[in-house]
């Protein structure tokens, strides 16, 4: 993965973003909650894709803060400027809030400006112990393989669900 340009991120981001020694992009909110963002290469055989990982390092409940999604979007936009690849995201199941996190994440990307440039889809999958989990994909609309990528995503998640026993 190509390194992200922090100057470009910080030119538009509400929160200052910096790179940690272990390669994670960090930012601290007005509520002193430290977040980490990193990207992990996926092993699928079809396309180059990265898992987008967003972690609340304080493990504290975060109040509604519009600066957080704005900062995350700046990071993701820079990811796509540097890497014409695919982002995958699995919502954390911590606290049983995965459905709410999936809706929130999609709202960020299906709203206003992002909808012009990205396609974001989320699907429910059957996880361990019959737990519902949510996986999302984000692809640039300009990607020449867009329809094929979305078809593979749908096929793979459908196949995954068919292989898992349902409650």
Model regions and ranges:
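Non-catalytic substrate-recognition and accessory regions of acyl/acetyltransferase enzymes
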Residues: 1-167
């Amino acid at each position: 993965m190509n390194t992200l340009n922090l100057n470009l991120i910080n030119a538009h981001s509400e929160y200052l973003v910096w790179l940690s020694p272990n390669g994670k992009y960090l930012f601290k909110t007005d509520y002193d909650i430290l977040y980490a963002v990193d990207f992990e290469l996926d092993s699928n055989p079809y396309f180059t894709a990265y898992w987008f990982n967003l972690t609340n390092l304080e493990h504290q409940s975060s109040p509604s803060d519009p600066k957080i999604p704005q900062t995350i979007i700046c990071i993701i936009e820079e990811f796509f400027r540097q890497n014409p690849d695919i982002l995958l995201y699995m919502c954390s199941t911590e606290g049983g809030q995965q459905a709410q996190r999936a809706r929130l994440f999609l709202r960020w990307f299906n709203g206003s400006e992002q909808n012009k440039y990205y396609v974001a889809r989320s699907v429910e999958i059957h996880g361990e112990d019959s737990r519902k989990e949510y996986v999302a994909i984000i692809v640039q609309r300009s990607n020449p393989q867009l329809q094929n990528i979305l078809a593979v995503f749908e096929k793979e998640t459908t196949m995954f669900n068919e292989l898992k026993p349902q409650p």
